[in-house]
Amino acid sequence: MSTLRLLISDSYDPWFNLAVEECIFRQMPATQRVLFLWRNADTVVIGRAQNPWKECNTRRMEEDNVRLARRSSGGGAVFHDLGNTCFTFMAGKPEYDKTISTSIVLNALNALGVSAEASGRNDLVVKTAEGDRKVSGSAYRETKDRGFHHGTLLLNADLSRLANYLNPDKKKLAAKGITSVRSRVTNLTELLPGITHEQVCEAITKAFFAHYGERVEAEIISPDKTPDLPNFAEIFARQSSWEWNFGQAPAFSHLLDERFSWGGVELHFDVEKGHITRAQVFTDSLNPAPLEALAGRLQGCLYRADMLQQECEALLVDFPDQEKELRELSTWIAGAVR
């Protein structure tokens, strides 16, 4: 029986692909070496310990239907579109060695005619007239008996959108969590015009087989049917949930302030696991009672625009004369936390 396994995903769904990756990683025999090739449509992928509100322009992502996906490895935030090729190498210990998987990717690039080299802890760079440019970033995860190395290759990514979604709004977030390091990047199409995802996958596959001296048939993972993988439905449900992608953010505080025609308002939220643990309201409004009531209602509320709006509008029953103020407040808060 071969010790190699090759999987290729036809899905562009980041939650689907990360769930497949997690399933394979959990159930693979310790003697197996796995290569999984995939790509995602418009997605910001954040590291396990990151705060999406700090790392991303979550409002613009929502407007443009860009998904958020939290991965199980560490590292920083990256934007994926179909101009990226994603790879995952998995192996049991002691065979797991990220220098081997890095060399396989470098060999694949070399076979395509690109001379790249490893830089720092997790990047691959090429030399250009403007200096070194990053074409690949990686992240890693290890457990007691196995590990994986996954990363992306920039083929023809829309680099203008990197700045759109990875530069967060200037929110007043006093947040813990790992801050992404921005790097100067370039696409492989600058060096190899017309290079395709299929060509890159083929080159990585050949380099993978060459390193281990054996070949296997590819297993195609299709979004059209549920993969025959242990606990896939459960893992996909978690991977696609708000509780995992947003709610796992490290604790942080968010300070909002705005001046309305009826008075100034300052809101201070403390947020843990995606829930507001403390809400304070300060105002010079002549009628502060609705705002004081709102602070009480927001305690324990999910830090999500629709939930905050719901709590604001629930106050209309008790404060019908302040409908205009409460609706203005509701719209403002929802916009500020998106």
From Swiss-Prot:
Binding positions ((R)-lipoate): K134
GO CC terms: cytosol
Top-rank lineage group of the source organism: Bacteria
Protein's UniProt keywords contain Kinase: no
Entry keyword annotation includes Transmembrane helix: no
EC category name: ligase
EC number: 6.3.1.20
Keywords on record: ATP-binding, Cytoplasm, Ligase, Nucleotide-binding
Bridged cysteine pairs (disulfide): none
GO aspect biological process, one term: protein modification process
Membership in a protein family: Belongs to the LplA family.
Subunit structure: Monomer.
Protein's name in the database: Lipoate-protein ligase A
Species in which this protein is naturally found: Shigella boydii serotype 18 (strain CDC 3083-94 / BS512)
Taxonomy of the source species: Bacteria, Pseudomonadati, Pseudomonadota, Gammaproteobacteria, Enterobacterales
Gene name for this UniProt entry: lplA
